[in-house]
Curated annotation (Swiss-Prot):
HAMAP family: Ribosomal_uS13 (MF_01315). This is Small ribosomal subunit protein uS13. Part of the 30S ribosomal subunit. Forms a loose heterodimer with protein S19. Forms two bridges to the 50S subunit in the 70S ribosome. It comes from the Archaea. One of its GO terms (molecular function) is structural constituent of ribosome. GO terms for biological process: translation. PROSITE patterns: RIBOSOMAL_S13_1, RIBOSOMAL_S13_2. Coiled coil: none annotated. Belongs to the universal ribosomal protein uS13 family. Located at the top of the head of the 30S subunit, it contacts several helices of the 16S rRNA. In the 70S ribosome it contacts the 23S rRNA (bridge B1a) and protein L5 of the 50S subunit (bridge B1b), connecting the 2 subunits; these bridges are implicated in subunit movement. Keywords: Ribonucleoprotein, Ribosomal protein, RNA-binding, rRNA-binding. GO terms for cellular component: cytosol; small ribosomal subunit. It comes from Thermococcus kodakarensis (strain ATCC BAA-918 / JCM 12380 / KOD1).
Length: 149
């Protein structure tokens, strides 16, 4: 059993720890959480509790196919991280660098069209309506000097 154990497994261009359970190891890939990882493994027919180091090459290939197009493999559209993409209108699940690039493009689009959210991003202020009087302060604090008596 130990002869086919791998300490590091490469899935979707990312090295994952072979000593962890597969569902937790997949969360090391940016864009994949524990719930989505469990869904992918259930669709692939892989035990989520087995160690990632015991995955075969066929199982890794199956996981990568599902990650490439999860909706086509039966994962519901509400579980993906990019439903109804702005440019294509498709339900997609982005991982690794593609996720970072898409997020950056979304913020830049909001800045370009001068949307309220884009302006808040530019100014480095909270975007989702939080209060700013006491939180989101930057820099060092300036104390109040006491008046001489």
């Amino acid at each position: 059993m130990t002869e086919n154990f791998r300490h590091i497994v490469r899935v979707a261009g990312v090295d994952i720890d072979g000593h962890k359970q597969v569902r937790w190891a997949l969360t090391g890939i940016k864009g994949i959480g524990i719930n989505f990882a469990t869904m992918v493994l259930r669709v692939a027919g892989i035990d989520p509790f087995m160690k990632a180091g015991y995955l075969t090459d066929e199982q890794v290939k199956k996981i990568e196919e599902i990650l490439a197009d999860p909706v086509a493999h039966g994962i519901p559209a509400w579980a993906v991280n990019r439903p109804k993409d702005y440019e294509t209108g498709k339900d997609m699940h982005l991982i690794t660098a593609k996720l970072v690039m898409a997020w950056r493009e979304d913020v830049n689009r909001l800045r370009r069209i001068r949307a309220y959210r884009g302006i808040r991003h530019e100014l480095g202020l909270p975007v989702r309506g939080q209060r700013t009087r006491s939180n989101f302060r930057h820099g060092t604090t300036v104390g109040v000097s006491r008046r001489k008596k």
